[in-house]
Amino acid sequence: MLLPKKMKLLLFLVSQMAILALFFHMYSHNISSLSMKAQPERMHVLVLSSWRSGSSFVGQLFGQHPDVFYLMEPAWHVWMTFKQSTAWMLHMAVRDLIRAVFLCDMSVFDAYMEPGPRRQSSLFQWENSRALCSAPACDIIPQDEIIPRAHCRLLCSQQPFEVVEKACRSYSHVVLKEVRFFNLQSLYPLLKDPSLNLHIVHLVRDPRAVFRSRERTKGDLMIDSRIVMGQHEQKLKKEDQPYYVMQVICQSQLEIYKTIQSLPKALQERYLLVRYEDLARAPVAQTSRMYEFVGLEFLPHLQTWVHNITRGKGMGDHAFHTNARDALNVSQAWRWSLPYEKVSRLQKACGDAMNLLGYRHVRSEQEQRNLLLDLLSTWTVPEQIH
């Protein structure tokens, strides 16, 4: 049966409208997909180091950037909850806490803090986080200013704990500084998680400088040192304990460095090794290198701040403070302040790490005191690692 002409025309118009609607749906879907892809992926950065290696300073280099949410050593809460445990037994708990914080899930701290109302000042060293001292966490200080920790502590300590999570979610980069990992294996699940886009900045320092700094702040590090020694503490003479701790630290830094080279190239490209001494000699250039690695713009006011903070007169003896200091003198201080006997013993404990990372041994007190003798070798990173 033939359809009337009006019916044919109506069907034709309906079909054309359906095609047009489908076209607009597909077009809008593609535009939506493109805009979603155009949004920058959130970057998660782990500054991985050890105590007294300049990591607080490196943390501040990231933390003062207006695009960064930064926390300093959140795993401190895990270790202080389980003081009788060992570093290796706590690796998984530390890793799980780090993952949660990267995802801005601050309920993870419930297991490590007293129940009841909390403030953001309940977090260890919270005042070192510019993000917790500016909006949306604390509206008093402008977001794009360099914020001294003393001002932060004075003005923002009463903010409720809930603002930590809110602040975390408002930044493109989440940076955590941690000194409580002793191998890379425990971090594999985070490295392989595509949703995290994890980048590791591995900061190392001359073990002799680390040892000298640890001696001057040993009271602050007593609990951490006991956890590192674990069951070995009772077997070691008191005078041997600092060297054992340094041996463990050196071995762990060495293993982390070597392990990264066995990973697939895609993972190796998310690892950056930085020597503190290189940073001390060329702070602006090395900071630029780290910023570029994680996709941050090196803003002019930050360049000025980095220059000034590394040209002060302080020697950086406090365990957790970052203030103006002469970075080059700090990196060399062990050469005139440590007895050669201690240096010689330390070189035996950390020799492999020193050799691989480019720290030359001294063979006499005369070599140690001769500041014209450069003990930092010109060191090329293997091709597959930045």
Curated annotation (Swiss-Prot):
It is an enzyme of class 2 (transferase). It is a single-pass type II membrane protein. Glycans are attached at N30, N308, N329. GO terms for molecular function: N-acetylglucosamine 6-O-sulfotransferase activity; sulfotransferase activity. Specifically expressed in HEV. Weakly expressed in spleen. Not expressed in other tissues. Expressed in colonic mucinous adenocarcinoma. One of its GO terms (cellular component) is trans-Golgi network. Residues 1-7 are cytoplasmic. It catalyses: 3-O-{N-acetyl-beta-D-glucosaminyl-(1->3)-beta-D-galactosyl-(1->3)-N-acetyl-alpha-D-galactosaminyl}-L-threonyl-[protein] + 3'-phosphoadenylyl sulfate = 3-O-{6-O-sulfo-N-acetyl-beta-D-glucosaminyl-(1->3)-beta-D-galactosyl-(1->3)-N-acetyl-alpha-D-galactosaminyl}-L-threonyl-[protein] + adenosine 3',5'-bisphosphate + H(+); 3-O-{N-acetyl-beta-D-glucosaminyl-(1->3)-beta-D-galactosyl-(1->3)-N-acetyl-alpha-D-galactosaminyl}-L-seryl-[protein] + 3'-phosphoadenylyl sulfate = 3-O-{6-O-sulfo-N-acetyl-beta-D-glucosaminyl-(1->3)-beta-D-galactosyl-(1->3)-N-acetyl-alpha-D-galactosaminyl}-L-seryl-[protein] + adenosine 3',5'-bisphosphate + H(+); a 3-O-{beta-D-galactosyl-(1->3)-[N-acetyl-beta-D-glucosaminyl-(1->6)]-N-acetyl-alpha-D-galactosaminyl}-L-threonyl-[protein] + 3'-phosphoadenylyl sulfate = 3-O-{beta-D-galactosyl-(1->3)-[6-O-sulfo-N-acetyl-beta-D-glucosaminyl-(1->6)]-N-acetyl-alpha-D-galactosaminyl}-L-threonyl-[protein] + adenosine 3',5'-bisphosphate + H(+); 3-O-{beta-D-galactosyl-(1->3)-[N-acetyl-beta-D-glucosaminyl-(1->6)]-N-acetyl-alpha-D-galactosaminyl}-L-seryl-[protein] + 3'-phosphoadenylyl sulfate = 3-O-{beta-D-galactosyl-(1->3)-[6-O-sulfo-N-acetyl-beta-D-glucosaminyl-(1->6)]-N-acetyl-alpha-D-galactosaminyl}-L-seryl-[protein] + adenosine 3',5'-bisphosphate + H(+). The keyword GTP-binding does not apply. The chain crosses the membrane at residues 8-28. It is found in: Golgi apparatus membrane. The keyword Isomerase does not apply. Pathway: Protein modification; carbohydrate sulfation. Residues 29-386 are lumenal. 3'-phosphoadenylyl sulfate binds at residues 51-57, 205-213. InterPro entries: Carbohydrate_sulfotransferase, Gal/GlcNAc/GalNAc_ST, P-loop_NTPase, Sulfotransferase_dom. Keywords: Carbohydrate metabolism, Glycoprotein, Golgi apparatus, Inflammatory response, Membrane, Signal-anchor, Transferase, Transmembrane, Transmembrane helix. PANTHER family: CARBOHYDRATE SULFOTRANSFERASE, CARBOHYDRATE SULFOTRANSFERASE 4. Belongs to the sulfotransferase 1 family. Gal/GlcNAc/GalNAc subfamily. This is Carbohydrate sulfotransferase 4. The lineage of its organism: Eukaryota, Metazoa, Chordata, Craniata, Vertebrata. The gene is CHST4.
